[in-house]
């Protein structure tokens, strides 16, 4: 038990998922959402893993809820766990690479949806929230080199 642990219990990170969704009809693009809730801004689709749910099912569910897309998960990309990555609480995110067909439609926590070339994020007109700029940069590096991001502390 540490000084940050509440008396009589543990404070564990909250599991989340984020999804890098590539559209079959728009190569070189990713799907982004404008968050309705704080922190507001552009983000990758994603959210919290529900109790009793595995991370892959959570990714498919969150993608459908926020974009209306039925995604096919291609690979588990990386885990991001910096305690400062989410200003609301300590989260850890399992990030997936997925593909989908069709037009995304904003729903649930998404106030808007955008399809943006991943080498031109400035076209979104605002910054990415959380650590999503790092995730996208790591993904671009992976696409160019085949090298996954190193573990971070």
Question: Where in the sequence are the language-model features?
Answer:
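Acidic, metal-coordinating catalytic segment for phosphate/diphosphate chemistry
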Residues: 1-20, 26
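Residue-level preference for beta-strand/loop junctions
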Residues: 13, 40, 88-92
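NUDIX/MutT-family hydrolases
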Residues: 40, 95-97, 105-142
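Conserved Nudix-box catalytic region and its N-terminal flanking loop in Nudix hydrolases
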Residues: 27-66
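Active-site segment of metal-dependent pyrophosphate-handling enzymes
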Residues: 68-103
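Acidic/histidine-enriched, glycine/proline-rich intrinsically disordered or flexible terminal extensions
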Residues: 137-153
């Amino acid at each position: 038990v540490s000084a940050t642990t509440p008396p009589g219990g543990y404070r564990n990170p909250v599991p989340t998922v984020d999804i890098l969704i590539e559209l079959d009809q728009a190569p070189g693009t990713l799907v982004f959402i404008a968050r309705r809730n704080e922190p507001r801004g552009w983000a990758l689709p994603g959210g919290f893993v529900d109790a009793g749910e595995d991370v892959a099912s959570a990714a498919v569910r969150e993608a459908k809820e926020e974009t209306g897309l039925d995604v096919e998960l291609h690979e588990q990309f990386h885990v991001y766990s910096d305690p400062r990555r989410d200003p609301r609480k300590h989260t850890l995110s399992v990030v997936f690479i997925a593909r989908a067909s069709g037009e995304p439609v904003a729903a649930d926590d998404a106030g808007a949806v955008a399809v943006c070339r991943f080498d031109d994020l400035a076209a979104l007109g605002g910054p990415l929230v959380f650590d999503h700029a790092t995730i996208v940069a790591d993904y671009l590096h992976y696409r160019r080199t085949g090298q996954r991001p190193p573990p971070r502390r």
